Amino acid sequence: MSPATLLRSPREVRELSRRWRGEGAVVGLVPTMGALHEGHLSLVRRAWEECGRVIVSVFVNPTQFGEGEDFERYPRDLEGDRRLLAEAGCDAVFAPAVEDMYGGGTTDLASGERIFVEAGRLGELWEGEERPGHFRGVCTVVAMLFNAAEPHRAYFGEKDYQQLKVIQKMARDLLFGVEIVPCPTVREPDGLALSSRNAYLSPQERRAARALWRALEAAAGEARGGVRDARRLERAMEEVCRAEPLVRLQYAAVVDAETLQRLGELGDRPARALIAARVGETRLIDNAALP
């Protein structure tokens, strides 16, 4: 199968999307930063099943990386990504350069003259506290992608759960008219959530990284057993991580599944367990619904 059509500029992707819309097609968008794995491809296949046309963006967005993070070394393989996407049902790949999205490129970003989309209080919690400015960058680039691609639907994985909730709220609050479609986390057989950053892990670190899923399972198991005390569930996660020397826990929290506010105890509203840790030098996040 030949690679999907490659688009470089916002104008190109907008013109193509409008042509498809004019033909009566439902347009689906899957935003990614590339280095694609089965988790991304599951989103593309879901979009292909539900939409007439599918656009996948491949853009390593500099504004969602903080100082000292891995923007420069984030894995990039556009040609490999295009081959995978063609097999998954992608019609077009939108892969702009930084200059295509941000005008003057990284120099312009440092000027302080650009307007950004703020993530509000939801974006200040958890990942927002650990990575200041991260969700401002995420909201800004996703808003730009929505404006360029003009999709009917956009597909996001639950693996980045806080990002999903922030984007859902942004789409509602800013009247984008884009349906945000959540998709389940895809995992390795041992439970590790698929992530492009897993490629950074050494074999020893890869084994240690399983502790994140085991921690989430420990909390879910306690909840299934009738434990309602959220702090006890958090301690169950902490204990699993403490037993693995290569894992440095950053947070393990039981939160309301919509507001992401920390809970004192489980109640009638859906709850989520969130976890973030460094395994060696690699930062990983994961989450799970609590019964």
From Swiss-Prot:
Name under which the protein is recorded: Pantothenate synthetase
Organism: Rubrobacter xylanophilus (strain DSM 9941 / JCM 11954 / NBRC 16129 / PRD-1)
Gene3D superfamilies reported in the protein's UniProt record: HUPs, Pantoate-beta-alanine ligase, C-terminal domain
Gene: panC
UniProt binding sites for (R)-pantoate: 64, 163
One of the record's GO cellular component terms: cytosol
InterPro entries: Cyt_trans-like, Pantoate_ligase, Pantoate_ligase_C, Rossmann-like_a/b/a_fold
Enzyme class: ligase
Family assignment from sequence similarity: Belongs to the pantothenate synthetase family.
SUBUNIT field: Homodimer.
Coiled-coil portions: none
Binding site for ATP: 33-40, 157-160, 186, 194-197
Binding site for beta-alanine: 64
One BP annotation, GO: pantothenate biosynthetic process
Keyword field contains Transport: no
Reaction(s) the record says it catalyses: (R)-pantoate + beta-alanine + ATP = (R)-pantothenate + AMP + diphosphate + H(+)
